[in-house]
């Protein structure tokens, strides 16, 4: 059992406050550093690290010493796909509760999706998100702005980028209009920012509920065919081919056919990136039978063949990063029949241990897995985080890699508990989360 505690981030650590992290296994996935040593922070920055640091003793001027007890000290996770529901649906989640959940999961930076009420398609809403983050967050809050306004016209992308947007998407819904998508890709290339697509042809998905296949037929439910995803991926890649310097990102990819198209585009030199969720790496349509509406998500859990393709795509680099699509819902929207229940699961507090299953079962190396959770997502949104380097922001976590525990949704910090991973036995526990040099979360074992 662990006692958990949190501290709001505010403006980060005091400028002159120093912290020495000793007896650490320091891992930096980008440089492939993996050493036993120490690390020093001052204010919000990493000052120094190495095997020989503090060999002559820790200076008395150091304000705080944290003994890592040979656990891993690594960059904090970066989740570029979360729904914090604020403004408009604060009964599901808020920036406060969502970021508290992130801190508990070792996630030091999140990117909020813009399908709030109202959407992040105006400067006013963008400013509101930034204000609420400063007031109530435990981690760094970034946001995508909407590609379109409520009337389906193009958002003022230049002003929204200036207001802090790290990219553009209509996630929750696709951009179905090809002309609008082409215009968004064109403008984004001029702004040097990313356009992210929720790839779903609504005519083909046709208000389906789960993957079209064996399980949908067995349960008598309308299915969502995998071509509804791949056809939009194919269309968008065709649209970007004649636009210079454009970056196109596919959210929560789920089908083998989509991956084949993405692989071909990358081989042609196009700047195409994509993400996969932990649940699409570990669950299939069969889990809908076991977990019911807790396994109802969009895109749906697909076949075992698709799942294996996701794992292989992550290993070989076709898939760039892991992101949760953290989608909180209150109980009464999930305790319904499959054909009426809401889509989505929460994922911030299970992101790391579920992803680590791929390491613990020998599928992928630890360094390569952690890369997809740290600097690789940072590269997609162009933020200087996810690395251990001198002068870089001190966004760090301490991880007990082999600690075994059982997921308990009732202990989630998130306001919502909709997860199919309840009672799953996992390995890997976040003991401390440090954001801008400031500890915002600790888990201390009860004796």
From Swiss-Prot:
Entry-linked InterPro entries: Amidohydro-rel (IPR006680), DHOase (IPR004722), DHOase/Allantoinase_Hydrolase (IPR050138), Dihydroorotase_CS (IPR002195), Metal-dep_hydrolase_composite (IPR011059), Metal_Hydrolase (IPR032466)
Keywords: Hydrolase, Metal-binding, Pyrimidine biosynthesis, Zinc
Alphabetical list of CDD domains matching this protein: DHOase_IIa
Pathway assigned to this chain's UniProt record: Pyrimidine metabolism; UMP biosynthesis via de novo pathway; (S)-dihydroorotate from bicarbonate: step 3/3
Binding locations of Zn(2+) 1: 81, 83, 171, 325
Cofactor: Zn(2+)
Alphabetical list of SUPFAM superfamilies matching this protein: Composite domain of metallo-dependent hydrolases, Metallo-dependent hydrolases
GO molecular function: allantoinase activity; dihydroorotase activity; zinc ion binding
Record NCBIfam families: pyrC_multi (TIGR00857)
Main function: Catalyzes the reversible cyclization of carbamoyl aspartate to dihydroorotate.
Protein name as catalogued: Dihydroorotase
Source species: Ehrlichia canis (strain Jake)
Encoding gene, per UniProt annotation: pyrC
